[in-house]
Regions:
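Short, low-complexity disordered leader/linker segments with a strong preference
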Residues: 1-33, 412
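Segments of small-molecule ligand-sensing domains
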Residues: 310-320, 331-393, 410
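Extracellular/periplasmic Venus flytrap/periplasmic-binding protein
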Residues: 88, 134, 142-253, 294-303
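Immediate post-signal peptide segment of exported/extracytoplasmic ligand-binding proteins
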Residues: 19-34, 65-71, 165-175
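Extracytoplasmic "Venus flytrap"
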Residues: 22-31, 35-56, 77-83, 106-107, ...
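Extracellular/periplasmic periplasmic-binding protein-like sensory domains
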Residues: 141, 251-324, 336-338, 395-412
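Beta-alpha junction/loop-to-helix N-cap segments that form part of ligand/metal-binding clefts
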Residues: 19-25, 46-53, 61, 65-138, ...
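Periplasmic-binding protein-like
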Residues: 93-106, 126-128, 176-181, 231-241, ...
Length: 412
């Protein structure tokens, strides 16, 4: 009985600690406070854990810079991947902790709700992971800025890639295309963005089937049968994280990869997926991600990846660099505008942001589009090739095709 009570106490203690994690400056020394929302346990827990390490690396990086940055305090709360909880947490951050910035959020459906609350509370929401283009389309949100690729950008690169790799003349048979994505906003927007970009590029294609498994679907057998039966040329998959891992593991038991090319242009190349699959990752899949551990091969990216590994014993998922970018963006805005600056001054600083990140190749610096508050970044699409430098992954991406941002094609 005593052992059981101790176990319950430790579980509750760990939960409290996870919800009250504080990083950076002390409460007394901080000139600004940031509230970050990430899933810290369950199927999406690796994103939160990696994000926390990314925040720590951001503080390390800032300490090395010649220019002084205002000290900031970062509070990390476990969103549990629940929209209602995340909305309450934002209000608690503002009213209890006096935060001026919210950062993070993995799930796009949750991000949409958090963005609404942030606008109501008049605090800046720096999106670091979610990718629905709905947040940066239409009327600009005064308090929302995103520092990782959105689905619009990924699908723009995807359409150019498809046009080059699967070119079909106007008189040839159209490319037979299938799409499978999660049954919520991110999946819907990715499909909408892909079709819009394929049409804009003049790609001759024909949609054979569109499938919508629910988030965290355990059994993809019915969806796999539908894809195999259609005999398509290209399957575009927009699942992510554990869902994509489960899909590929189950697809390995079918003939899907034998008769169709497979692509995931936004999240498929995430190291989390590559490492989880290990030897089960097939060769020749077309994948991309918001950060790659083996591209670009710059000193900055090497430092980020190796330092992350030194701290954790594993290599980073893209969530780590997203959180890293979020803290750098907030710090840079505070440095430029000042910690006591008005909302408009901070908005101007974020709108004109130029931020050198680990994912930036030589000669390129990520920059904010002031028209929609979406950071503009280079996108690298590759194919899985044998590479055991980043174990437990047995496949990494190679055969790269690189796409620089085309600002004129971004939504206003």
């Amino acid at each position: 009985m005593i052992v059981r009570l101790i176990g319950i106490f430790l579980l509750l203690l760990n939960t409290v600690e996870a919800e009250e994690l504080a990083l950076g400056a002390s409460k007394a020394d901080a000139q600004a406070t940031v509230g970050c929302l990430f899933p810290m346990g369950g199927r999406g827990g690796i994103y939160g854990q990696d994000s926390v390490t990314g925040i720590k690396l951001a503080f390390e990086h800032l300490k090395k810079q010649p220019l002084p940055y205002p000290p900031i305090r970062v509070l990390v709360s476990d969103s549990s991947s629940k929209a209602s909880k995340a909305a309450r947490q934002v209000r608690n951050f503002v009213r209890k902790d006096g935060v001026r910035f919210i950062c993070g959020v993995v799930n796009s459906a949750i991000a949409l709700q958090v963005a609404e609350v942030a606008e109501e509370e008049k605090v800046f929401f720096i999106g670091t992971d979610h990718a629905s283009s709905k947040l940066t389309r239409g009327k600009v949100r005064d308090y929302y800025f995103r520092v990782s690729n959105n689905a619009e950008q990924s699908m723009q690169a995807a359409a150019i890639y498809i046009k080059k790799k699967f070119a079909r003349g106007p008189r040839a048979q159209p490319l037979k295309l299938a799409y499978i994505g999660p049954d919520y906003d991110y999946g819907y927007q990715a499909w909408k963005d892909l079709r819009a970009r394929l049409d804009a590029e003049g790609v001759n294609y024909q949609v054979e089937t569109v499938l919508w498994p629910k988030l965290y679907e355990p059994d993809y057998s019915a969806y796999l049968r539908a894809l195999v039966d259609k005999k398509v040329d290209l399957v575009v998959n927009a699942l992510w994280g554990g869902d994509l891992v489960a899909f590929i593991q189950q697809a390995n038991q079918t003939t899907l990869f034998e008769h169709a090319r497979f692509a995931n242009f936004d999240t498929g190349g995430n190291y989390e997926v590559l490492s989880a699959l290990g030897e089960d990752m097939p060769e020749g899949l077309i994948l991309s991600s918001r950060h790659h551990n083996n591209w670009p091969q710059t000193d900055y990216n090497t430092w980020f990846v190796e330092r992350f590994h030194a701290l954790t014993g594993r290599y980073p998922s893209y969530a780590a660099e997203g959180a890293y970018a979020g803290i750098l963006a907030i710090s840079e805005a505070l440095r430029v505008a000042g910690p006591e600056a008005s909302d408009q001054a901070l908005r101007d600083a974020l709108s004109s942001l130029h931020l050198k990140l680990p994912e930036d190749p030589e000669g390129f610096i990520s920059f904010m589009n002031p028209l929609n508050h979406q950071l503009q970044q280079v996108i690298a699409i590759g194919e899985t090739v044998p590479d055991q430098r980043f174990l437990p992954a047995r496949m990494m991406l190679g055969n790269w095709m690189i796409y620089h941002p085309q600002l004129s094609n971004q939504p206003e």
